[in-house]
Regions:
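A short acidic, amphipathic alpha-helical/loop segment
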Residues: 143-147, 367, 474, 478
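Mid-to-C-terminal polyanion-binding domains and interfaces
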Residues: 66-70, 309-354, 387, 400, ...
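Acidic-glycine-rich active-site phosphate/pyrophosphate-binding loop
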Residues: 66, 165-175, 261, 514-517
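A residue-level signal for conserved active-site and pocket-lining positions in enzyme catalytic cores
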Residues: 30, 133, 289, 479, ...
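Active-site cavity-forming subdomains of large catalytic enzyme subunits
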Residues: 122-191, 195-211
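Hydrophobic helix-and-loop "lid/oligomerization" segment in the mid-to-C-terminal part
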Residues: 9-130, 151, 203-435, 465, ...
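Short helix/loop capping segments that flank catalytic or ligand/cofactor-binding pockets
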Residues: 85-86, 143, 239, 293-296, ...
């Protein structure tokens, strides 16, 4: 059962933000998210943390500049998700502009699995590279880097995943989460790390006079890729990431984007001039990810690197078809998961582990996320892998760091996990199929130790009541222009309403007419058909509804409770 709670607001911070000219509601919302001064809301690129603060970024830049000068062959080895694809495309665009001889390789997840493995090194060696550059992977590739070294191939690792006990012996490792790195933003996505390396490389090339007599490549032109990868990877939107995403969205809205990004907006039926974080995370990101989930992410990367508008649209349509196929597979898996969950005492457990031999390896992460959202339990979903192995993808709730939890499982049950890695909120692992039940029990034991009853109770966190006078289109438009996402959630308000009317629209949604404080407003409940009582307490967000060129205010109801009056 979910309960509505209100975020505390530091009044001193709120008052300071109002004095500095912020709208009173925006000031309250920002103060509740830890913002205390106007400068933390501004999005100027000049406010970014400098590349010199990122450990080994300058060392990587020197290695890359030397390789460019020597005409060495570079090969980017990418991860197969949206973050990896955008990081690869950004690197390809930037390095090509800098005069590098560069190509890319993305492992097929079904054949090779994740990361720079020795098998991938053998495959990469066919292109005769002098230098491998990992993007969004590599921090755990100890054996892969050794395999490359034995072949005389240098490796630069750019990654953001949490390091293990042993680091690969790469020529340079750039990762804000490695020991000794004082970079303040630990939440850079893989594409963000690669962007910073390219900034450092441009500075190094400038120092060497490489741009003498010609225009420097404008890395800001790649911020659309950076915004897409950052939002799609669901990394926390701290100040640095908000600046990067905001600047990327501004360029998209102004029509300054890669042809592939333009094409993805087209197949999603969205207007890029009104681009939002929602578009990047829920519409473009899934279409790119569909390539890595069901086919080969090379298709997604080609979409992002091509400069041919027609080719970009052709690929985007293929990605759209793959995404539709993914939805069908996901729906079938969800039905099967519901059958498995019906046999479990989910309410009495602290975790959920699910496995079905028919499940698709590329879709288990989405399934785990859906189950986690519905039941508010850290969840792993598994599908068959190679030979006698199964591969799982997990999603967690606040209070349980998923990678740390897996590390604890591995220490308590040596040999149980074949391999694992990830973040606080998401992780992946491989184990033997025969060990699934043993893993489920071990993970449950760890979750029971780490989670309190309070953390297992779902809470709908809101920004409190909104004065009726602020139920207007202007505020909805103001909030829509801000950057919201992981760690900096979109405002959700809570008030009591009288329900004047409700009807089903689009077969699975409900449209409502609500009244509060003498004001009548339209609202929507998506994917909900049950009728509301005459009075409700609702958690809602303001949205801008556009129809036939006219914009109106519309509330989106996220949660409701009966008021008792």
């Amino acid at each position: 059962m979910s309960g509505i709670v209100t975020r505390p607001v530091p009044l001193r911070s709120q008052d300071q933000l109002v004095r500095e000219g912020l709208h009173p509601v925006l000031a309250r919302v920002c103060a509740a998210r830890g913002i205390s001064r106007r400068g933390e809301v501004d999005d100027a690129l000049s406010g970014l943390i400098p590349p010199s603060d990122l450990l080994n970024a300058e060392r990587a830049a020197v290695l890359l500049a030397d390789a460019i000068a020597a005409g060495k062959r570079m090969l980017i080895v990418a991860d197969y998700d949206c973050d990896g694809a955008t990081a690869c495309a950004l690197g390809m665009r930037a390095l090509t502009a800098f005069g590098a001889n560069v190509g890319y390789l993305v492992p097929n997840r079904f054949e090779f699995g994740y990361g720079l493995t020795p098998e991938i090194v053998v495959l990469a060696a066919k292109s005769k590279p002098d230098l491998l550059i990992t993007v969004d992977n590599g921090i755990a590739s100890v054996e892969g880097v050794e395999a490359a070294r034995e072949l005389g191939i240098e490796v630069i690792v750019t990654d953001h995943h949490l390091p293990g006990a042993e680091l690969p012996r790469a020529a340079a490792i750039v990762n804000p989460n490695q020991a000794g790195c004082a970079f303040p933003s630990k939440s850079l996505a893989g594409v963000g790390v690669m962007f910073y390396v390219m900034l450092a490389l441009r500075a190094e090339l400038r120092k060497r006079g490489a741009f003498s007599g010609k225009e420097e490549p404008a890395l800001a032109d790649l911020l659309d890729l950076l915004a897409l990868g950052t939002v799609a990877d669901v990394v926390p939107l701290d100040f640095n990431n908000r600046v990067l995403v905001s600047q990327g969205l501004k360029r998209i809205r102004a029509g300054r984007m890669q042809e592939g990004v333009r094409a993805l907006f087209a197949v999603a039926g969205r207007d890029p001039s009104r681009a939002s974080g929602f578009d990047l995370g829920f519409l473009l990101g899934p279409r790119l990810n569909a390539a890595g989930r069901l086919s080969d992410m090379s298709l997604g990367i080609e979409c992002l690197v091509t400069t041919d508008r027609g080719r970009a649209l052709e690929i985007a349509r293929q990605l759209d078809d793959l995404n539709r196929e993914r939805r069908v597979i996901e729906a079938d898996m969800q039905s099967q998961a519901d059958e498995l969950l019906a046999k479990l005492s989910v309410g009495d457990s602290c975790s959920i582990s699910l496995y079905d031999p028919s499940w698709h390896q590329g879709v288990v992460g989405i399934l785990a996320g859906r189950v986690k959202e519905r039941h508010h339990r850290p969840t792993f979903a598994f599908a068959p892998g190679n030979s006698d192995e199964i591969r799982g993808s997990g999603r967690s709730i606040a209070g349980l760091h998923l990678r740390d939890a897996l590390d604890l499982v591995a220490k308590r049950a040596p040999g149980l996990l074949v391999r694992f890695g990830g973040h606080a909120a998401a992780a992946g692992l491989t184990l033997r199929a025969a060990d699934f039940t043993r893993f489920a029990e071990a993970f449950e034991s760890v979750a029971r130790q780490l989670l309190s009853p309070g953390q297992l109770a779902r809470a709908v966190e809101t920004d409190g009541s909104l004065e009726p006078a602020y139920l207007d289109l202007g505020l909805a438009q103001l909030l829509e222009r801000q950057i919201w996402g992981q760690g900096f959630p979109q405002p959700l308000f809570c008030d009591e309403f009288e329900v004047l009317g409700q009807r089903v629209v689009g077969e699975k949604h409900t449209k409502l007419n609500l009244s509060r404080g003498g004001r009548t407003v339209e609202a929507m409940r998506f994917n909900a058909l049950d009728s509301l009582p005459s009075r409700v307490r609702a958690a809602y967000r303001l949205s801008v509804n556009e129809f036939n060129g006219a914009q109106t205010l519309q509330l989106v109801i996220e949660h409701w409770e009966k008021t008792g009056t």
